[in-house]
């Protein structure tokens, strides 16, 4: 994932969960075989089956925000594994308290309300077997949304902030469209155009690609000034070296 000469390699698998096909990521060290789930929204048996298939011991749950399709299985993972639940920002606790009630509206009945062991703040760091991940508070979709990223590994887990060709909804309670756009341009774009991201739903993309043609946050739309995106083959070469 990062510089292979100085840091352990990490593996990642993206596992769609819930009827909403939310992307849960499982990240683990191939040296210790310890790993974390990012945004375990539901389908606990499917998630634990994936961990068993790859021989991963789940030691943590990292949440980008409090919506039930991203956090609904966090408590179940902790109950089964003892994993520490980290994130999101404290401003999303009200959503974590409504997982069960909101799930009923979408026919998702296995979610559980949850309180994290630790909230995240802008600038915090997370670690998995010596590999450091940064945290950016990116409100807009929800007030307590965070993005978790590894800059040297050129990868980010953006939850529902950004998608291929779109951005997160802001018509939910306490959503704010302008705040969302500001979060993307001020917190994500400076990380670099070669950052590849796992969105909450749908396919992966790069920040450079979205700056080029996303109808909501392309540079031509926002007027953002910054480095232009790397050529696609350069991005692929970097990713091939960093993620194996």
Predicted regions mapped to residue ranges:
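Short, conserved catalytic or adaptor-binding loops enriched in Gly and charged residues
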Residues: 2-7, 110-111
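Conserved beta-strand hairpin/beta-sheet module of binuclear metal-dependent hydrolase folds
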Residues: 5-54, 147-159
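Hydrophobic/aromatic beta-strand patches that form the interior of the parallel beta-sheet core
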Residues: 13, 62, 86, 118-120, ...
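Conserved S/T- and glycine-rich ATP-binding loop of Class I adenylate-forming
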Residues: 27, 64, 138
């Amino acid at each position: 994932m990062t510089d292979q000469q100085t840091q352990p390699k990490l593996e990642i698998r993206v596992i769609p969960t819930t009827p909403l096909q939310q992307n849960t990521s499982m990240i683990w060290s191939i040296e210790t075989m310890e790993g974390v789930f990012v945004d375990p929204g539901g389908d606990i048996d499917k998630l634990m089956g994936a961990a068993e298939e790859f021989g991963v011991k789940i030691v943590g749950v990292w949440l980008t925000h409090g919506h039930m399709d991203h956090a609904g299985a966090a408590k179940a993972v902790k109950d089964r594994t003892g994993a520490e639940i980290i994130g999101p920002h404290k401003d999303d606790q009200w959503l974590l308290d409504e997982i069960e009630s909101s799930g009923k509206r979408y026919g998702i009945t296995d979610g559980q309300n949850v309180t994290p062991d630790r909230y995240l703040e802008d600038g915090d760091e997370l670690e998995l077997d010596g590999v450091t991940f940064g945290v950016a508070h990116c409100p807009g979709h929800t007030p307590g949304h965070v993005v978790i990223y590894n800059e040297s590994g050129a990868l980010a887990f953006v939850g529902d902030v950004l998608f291929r060709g779109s951005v997160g909804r802001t018509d939910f309670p306490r959503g704010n469209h302008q705040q969302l756009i500001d979060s993307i341009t001020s917190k994500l774009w400076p990380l670099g155009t070669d950052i590849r991201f796992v969105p909450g739903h749908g396919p992966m993309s790069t920040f450079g690609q979205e700056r080029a043609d996303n109808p909501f946050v392309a540079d031509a739309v926002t007027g953002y000034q910054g480095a232009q995106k790397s050529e696609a083959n350069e991005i692929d070469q970097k990713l091939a070296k960093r993620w194996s």
